[in-house]
Design a protein with these regions (language model features):
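Phosphate-binding/catalytic loops
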Residues: 120-125
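Positively charged, polar, low-complexity stretches
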Residues: 1-112, 117
């Protein structure tokens, strides 16, 4: 097996582990946000027990399927970041929603709560 393939499999396993251990995952589009904006958002979420990461969409699709969550494939298009929520889902969702109000380039796409796919509207409530 090639080194590149084994590295990709390791990344997929890492993402799958994060999905399986998180109480929820929130998928966002960050097109046009600056590095400073993303760093500020990561800092806010980190304080709530949420990790906000950018991964390749293809690897996220594989990891979600391996974690047993079907229906997220359509959300992994374009510049995508994932919030892995280990803390309070409501507080993390509110932080993302409030950040999106002041930074309209951040778009909440949807996610999964307890391995069930949810819409962006569900997360924004």
């Amino acid at each position: 097996m090639s080194t590149v393939r084994s590295e990709k499999e390791a990344v997929v396993a890492e993402i799958r582990g994060k999905i399986e251990s998180a109480s929820a995952v929130i998928i966002t589009e960050y097109r046009g946000l600056t590095v400073q904006n993303l760093a500020a958002l990561r800092g806010q979420l980190r304080g709530l027990g949420t990790e906000y990461r950018v991964y390749k969409n293809t690897m996220c699709r594989f990891a979600a399927r391996e974690a047993g969550i079907e229906g997220l494939d359509d959300l992994f298009v374009g510049p995508t970041a994932i919030a892995f929520v280990d803390g309070d889902l409501a507080a993390s969702a509110k932080t993302l929603k409030d950040f999106a109000k002041t930074n309209p380039l951040l778009v909440l796409r949807g996610g999964a709560v307890s391995n069930k796919v949810v819409s962006a509207e569900y997360i924004q409530v």
